[in-house]
A protein has these predicted regions:
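Bacterial N-terminal signal peptides
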Residues: 3-14
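Cyclophilin-like peptidyl-prolyl cis-trans isomerases
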Residues: 15-212
Length: 212
């Protein structure tokens, strides 16, 4: 019996301290060519989407990506959203995250909201995200539409977001992006978490080996 107790004690000592829990809100600093934007990522209310985004941040997968879309509202061009992230760069992509609808999280597409972009399929979000300028309730979940996942808010640099929204766009493009692709995309020089402990995935950083 004493031997078993001793072995158990050694096992507990060898296990070391438990990993610290993620803070309920994690701030992320985006340093861009247009200035600094600070996001507050809501780990508590949108845990899957938040952890997915933070994985990209902790891996450095957002460093060198761009804000490439400025979607201005017709009749009120000072409102809309900007979109950025990995775009179609498959070298940076991790597995898609399941949609956490606003009807589940209680988060809404209010002014400054951070929203996960996706393809037509519901569970197709990766690391393209939108920053709201003004409220966009049409992007919330509603009967007949799953909407998009809100997972944070802008807490610093909203003036930078508005400046990006006002930048020139090309008249071309297809579908919803027609006329919204920026003439000169704004590079995200770095994305850095300001709270909690980074949890890199350990995956190969292929985009660093074969730069475009």
């Amino acid at each position: 019996m004493q031997v078993l107790v001793g072995l158990l004690a050694l096992a507990l000592l060898g296990a070391g301290p438990a990993a610290p829990a993620e803070p309920p809100v994690v701030r992320v600093k985006l340093t861009t060519q247009a200035g600094v934007i600070v996001l507050a990522i809501d780990v508590k209310r949108a845990p899957a989407t938040a952890r997915n985004f933070l994985a990209y941040v902790d891996d450095g997968r957002l460093d060198g990506t761009r804000f490439y879309r400025a979607s201005r509202r017709k009749g009120a061009p000072q409102l809309g959203f900007v979109q950025g992230g990995i775009d179609t760069d498959a070298r940076r992509r991790l597995e898609p995250v399941a949609l956490e609808p606003t009807s589940k999280t209680g988060l809404r597409h209010v002014d400054g909201a951070v929203s996960m972009a996706r393809y037509e399929g519901v569970n197709t979000g990766t690391a393209n995200f939108s920053l709201m300028v003004g409220a966009s309730p049409n992007m919330d979940a509603r009967p007949g539409s799953p909407g998009y996942a809100v997972f944070g808010r802008v807490v610093g640099g909203m003036d930078v977001v508005k400046r990006i929204l006002a930048m020139p766009t090309n008249p071309g493009g297809d579908g919803a992006m027609k006329g919204q692709l920026m003439t000169r995309p704004v590079t995200i020089l770095s994305a850095q978490r300001l709270d909690g402990t980074p949890h890199p995935t350990g995956r190969a950083k292929v985009w660093l080996l074969f730069r475009r």
